[in-house]
Amino acid sequence: NTDQSFPGFLGSEMWNPNTDLSEDCLYLNVWIPTPKPKNATVMIWIYGGSFQTGTSSLHVYDGKFLARVERVIVVSMNYRVGALGFLALPGNPEAPGNVGLFDQQLALQWVQKNIAAFGGNPKSVTLFGESAGAASVSLHL
């Protein structure tokens, strides 16, 4: 079975059914409880997928319930995966490898600079994830 949205690429939707996928992927999702909090704890979710597949926009990762029930701000991020995120070509400065982790670092920096505008406390941030997301958390500590 060839996925017609990515001609010639087998299984691009295997773990992300009915999800629009694109190289234009560097986006964040932010869920804020209502009423807007002041100085709320921030929880940042990093999805897994063996660093090969995944997206933060799956319904199972919807942070609105956690934000509402726990009165926290929930942030999830996309980052480049597969060869686009983790291909390393030693000696080639244009492909140093692990750029997916750099994408994550940029998202973390964005949260630090901007989360106060959403009612979040940049000094009270918890990173969490599953599988490759959990490994990413350990790499950022």
From Swiss-Prot:
Residue positions where Phosphoserine is found in the record: S131
Record-listed substrate binding positions: G49, S50
One GO MF term attached to the UniProt entry: cholinesterase activity
Keyword Secreted: yes
Assembly with partners or alone: Homotetramer; disulfide-linked. Dimer of dimers.
Organism phylogeny: Eukaryota, Metazoa, Chordata, Craniata, Vertebrata
Keyword tags: Disulfide bond, Glycoprotein, Hydrolase, Phosphoprotein, Secreted, Serine esterase
Catalyzed chemical reaction(s): an acylcholine + H2O = a carboxylate + choline + H(+)
Family designation: Belongs to the type-B carboxylesterase/lipase family.
Annotated catalytic residues: S131 (acyl-ester intermediate)
Record-linked Gene3D superfamilies: alpha/beta hydrolase
InterPro entries tied to this protein: AB_hydrolase_fold, AChE-related_enzymes, CarbesteraseB, Carboxylesterase_B_AS, Carboxylesterase_B_CS, Cholinesterase
GO BP term (any one): acetylcholine catabolic process
EC number(s) stated in the UniProt entry for this protein: 3.1.1.8
SUPFAM superfamilies: alpha/beta-Hydrolases (SSF53474)
Keyword Cytoplasm in annotation: no
Entry's localization field: Secreted
Function: Esterase with broad substrate specificity. Contributes to the inactivation of the neurotransmitter acetylcholine. Can degrade neurotoxic organophosphate esters.
Protein name: Cholinesterase
Tissues showing expression: Present in most cells except erythrocytes.
Glycosylation sites: N39
GO CC annotations, alphabetized: extracellular space; plasma membrane
